[in-house]
Amino acid sequence: MSASQTSDVPTLLVKIFGKDRPGITAGLFDTLAAYSVDVVDIEQVVTRGRIVLCALVTEPPRGLEGDLRATVHSWAESLKLQAEIISGIGDNRPRGFGRSLVTVLGHPLTAEATAAIAARITESGSNIDRIFRLAKYPVTAVEFAVSGVETEPLRTALATEAAALGVDIAVVAAGLHRRAQRLVVMDVDSTLIQDEVIELFAAHAGCEDEVAEVTAAAMRGELDFEQSLHARVALLAGLDASVVDKVRAEVRLTPGARTLIRTLKRLGYQVGVVSGGFTQVTDALQEQLGLDFAQANTLEIVDGRLTGRVTGEIVDRAGKARLLRRFAAAAGVPLSQTVAIGDGANDLDMLNAAGLGVAFNAKPVVREAAHTAVNVPFLDTVLYLLGITREEVEAADTLADDLGDGPGRP
């Protein structure tokens, strides 16, 4: 074991800050190299053109520390930078148990909200080890790496702050399992798309109000989903089957849906949808978006008209969870490596069964029960909960465009 790997070795923390320019990092370590020091740790960040570079190194041989300090300060001054050198022992203290990642989404993210979140993390007994910006638009997304408290109580402590401050806060356990998630399954109506498909059909049948009333009650969990499904579909009896193509054309993807799916597919994820809506729409979405899995209810059509009935397996609350398990088995992925996204009460079993359940612009009962919630109108913000940065997404799009295989961004 080298001296730099022991906890009691004398070290120097060298901090450089000022206007960023090429060559600062190389210049600092070239200066330090003359004193035979070992590098213990390095951190560097550039914010609005200003650099903060911290290097933790072992002390130089006896009698040379004063010369090292003078040389570093002289080098920094020559570049109009500031330098600070602090003596100490060893490296950072070991991170505490209960390592978690706290992702905060704000539109905007205010100083007041940031202060309240940091204070609640501290009050819970956690320590903030690192802060990193994941995205600056369409929302500001910031990730806090914290330690000292188990994930579940920290999530509970921050849930109240999220509601009061008007931000979204996701808390997940840190570790390799986060990088291992390989299957994402989402609801369709009001999640993948902005619409409720049954209401699009109802508009053509002239029964929007009746269908909307039943839909709202079902999504709040006040009605049995299967009963409400049959009641709503019955109102469509006699509708000409040509309406199916019209409804497909009316469907509007949620902003960020293409970006989410495109990015996940590039990373090797499999992506599926489950819907209490209809295969007449989800099959088209599967082909359009390149989805690996899709399952929904099927409207019965006889002699060119809707009969007012559905056929086959009913996709309800329990059915969505069952399909998540089925898709995971087909993909060879354990449930712990799945992500589920939904907005309604009939998504709850699926959200709870997944390794990470995300309530997307959901009803209060769903937000409270899910692992985490997102309340901004951009579906690709789910990527930030997986630790994927906006910069990485855009770089991948640019590379695809340069190679001539860009998918056509929304």
From Swiss-Prot:
Residues 13-91 form the ACT domain. It catalyses: O-phospho-L-serine + H2O = L-serine + phosphate; O-phospho-D-serine + H2O = D-serine + phosphate. GO terms for biological process: L-serine biosynthetic process. It is an enzyme of class 3 (hydrolase). Signal peptide: none annotated. Mg(2+) binds at residues 187, 189, 343. Coiled coil: none annotated. It comes from the Bacteria. GO terms for cellular component: cytoplasm. Pathway: Amino-acid biosynthesis; L-serine biosynthesis; L-serine from 3-phospho-D-glycerate: step 3/3. The active site is at residues 187, 189. One of its GO terms (molecular function) is magnesium ion binding. InterPro entries: ACT-like_dom_sf, ACT_dom, HAD-like_SerB, HAD-like_sf, HAD_sf, PSP, PSP_ACT. Its cofactor is Mg(2+). Belongs to the HAD-like hydrolase superfamily. SerB family. This is Phosphoserine phosphatase. It comes from Streptomyces coelicolor (strain ATCC BAA-471 / A3(2) / M145).
